[in-house]
Amino acid sequence: QIKDLQEQIKRGRIMTVNGGYVYKANVVYSGVDLLGIDEIDIKTSTYRMDFYLWFRYRPNERDVDFKPDDFVFTNAEGEVEIAPIREETNADGTVLKTYRVSGTFKNQFRFYDYPFEHQDLIIEFRNQNATTSFIQYVVDRIGMRYESEEKLLGNYRENGAFSSIFGWQPQSARVDQDIFPTFSTFGNPQNFGRSVATNYSLINVNVDIQRDSLQYIVKSLLPLLITLILAYITFFLPLGHSERLAVGSTALLTTAFFHL
């Protein structure tokens, strides 16, 4: 049973087709232009992202609750700075809203292949109130010049997005559209008996980075190896007990220091 059927039809959310009723989803093109990545923290699996975010859509003046840019980040860690920088109407009647976004995000890192591992730096956002029946986010491939993952990575690189990360190398970038399901009833009695999820349209931005293994080996493993070799050589030198103990203690402390 559809709640407030006539009101939904009046707002343009539902239309009649062959005597039946169907939801009319509004397509909203969404794009992300990455400007910077820094503060990658492997202990907390967090990272800071700075980027432009925009929405392009055809307005629906009949529906006062039609708010395509009413979005929320699903993997934000703390407050996210969102600054509107542009709102304009294009010649074809579509509306463009652009934001500058900066904040810390989280995606659980995996270290199975350490120190040769890859990590995914992810940004996810969804519409906060409208389900997929009313609003569908679609990746704005044209606006992002997203011809391929390699092209998108190159665009981000030209923006200087990777100039502040050290010890990591970007490998690929992609943007996908998906759904965010929830089984919450939101306290609405109409949802108490529902066994299916409520779906919200979601955009996922994924930047794959790989640890710079050579840099890690030169800066971390090589000094340890040299220290251990020098400590081993002392066993073949004509040194007294106290001298050997001092060299061994120094090697042990040096090894512990490099693991801090």
Each language-model region and where it sits:
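Channel- or pocket-lining gating/hinge segments that regulate access to a cavity or pore
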Residues: 202-260
